[in-house]
Structure formats: structure tokens, C-alpha cells
Amino acid sequence: MKIILRADVENLGRLGDVVTVKPGFGRNYLLPQGLGMLASQANLKAFELERKKLQARMDALRNAAADIAAKLEGLVLAIPMRVGENDKLYGSVTTAIIGDGLAAQGIEVDRRRILLDSAIRALGEYPVRVRLHADVTAEILVKVVSEDKVNDVAESAPAEEPEAAAE
């Protein structure tokens, strides 16, 4: 089955490519999701008229992703986690936890865009890639720290502020 792609599809092709796919993939995924259309002569002509609109939309998405990547680049994200003996984490740091941490910083990123080779299971610093668009990737540094140390720092910081206010 020949399909004209109406958007970039990972591991398949880019906007405007005519690709051959298995009929089930085309009928059950590409066509219903609006990612492609059947490659007939009439659809090829209609697509050429629609191509500029789709390309403008894709460029706008790429530019928005580049703006978010500029905010993310060089960001150090501290993730407080409960630890047991020998600094072993209870559980692990997953993409959902990293996504929540970024949301707390005011940067909304879908957890599926965060690329982890495997879950983080120990304290330390880990470089994590965030794929915002097919062409735009940013790298952040995730620093996994003990929850106890974060609480100690949080308790000592407010204690110092009232003294400064009293002076």
C-alpha cells in the first residue's frame, strides 16, 4: 500500500514522502491518525496544494521546540529521592518523575520525549536527552539527591531568613 505522509513519522519518512507500508499499518494507524493519505493521482495533486500549509505548521512546531530546547540546554534538575543504606534508592527515577521535575521548573515536556537508556537507581548526576522534535534534541543534567539532604537544606534556609528580616 502506497501512502503520502502528511507529517514526519519516526522510522518511516518525512512530510511529503511516498512510502510503501503494509496494508494494516496504513489502514489502522496512518490513515485514522491523519499521518498519511492514499497515494493516488488525485491525492498527489491535492497534497501539493496542501503541502505549504503543512510545511508551515511543521516549521512552527520545530521553532517552538527550538525555543524549549534553548531553555533546557544546560539545565541542572535536582530530583530528591528516598534512599536506604549504602545510598541505594527506594524505587528509581523514571521519565515521569523527570517530567514532573521539569513541570515544576515551568517547562512542560511530555514524558515520552525524555530519553532514558534505563531507569536511574543510584544517587549521582546523569545526562539525559530530551527529543523535542525530530530535528531538535536538548540535554539536561539530572542530579539525584537524598531527600534527607534536601529537607536539611530546606529547614536551615527558612531559619536564616527571619534573622535577616529582624535586622
Curated annotation (Swiss-Prot):
Gene3D superfamilies (alphabetical): Ribosomal protein L9, C-terminal domain, Ribosomal protein L9, N-terminal domain
Gene Ontology molecular function terms on file: rRNA binding; structural constituent of ribosome
BP GO terms, sorted: translation
Keyword Transport: no
PROSITE patterns: RIBOSOMAL_L9
Superkingdom, natural source: Bacteria
GO CC annotation: ribonucleoprotein complex; ribosome
Keywords: Ribonucleoprotein, Ribosomal protein, RNA-binding, rRNA-binding
Family matches, as InterPro entries: Ribosomal_bL9, Ribosomal_bL9/RNase_H1_N, Ribosomal_bL9_bac/chp, Ribosomal_bL9_C, Ribosomal_bL9_C_sf, Ribosomal_bL9_N, Ribosomal_bL9_N_sf
Pfam family, one: Ribosomal_L9_N
Family to which the UniProt record says this protein belongs: Belongs to the bacterial ribosomal protein bL9 family.
HAMAP family attached to this UniProt entry: Ribosomal_bL9 (MF_00503)
Biological role stated in the UniProt entry: Binds to the 23S rRNA.
Protein name: Large ribosomal subunit protein bL9
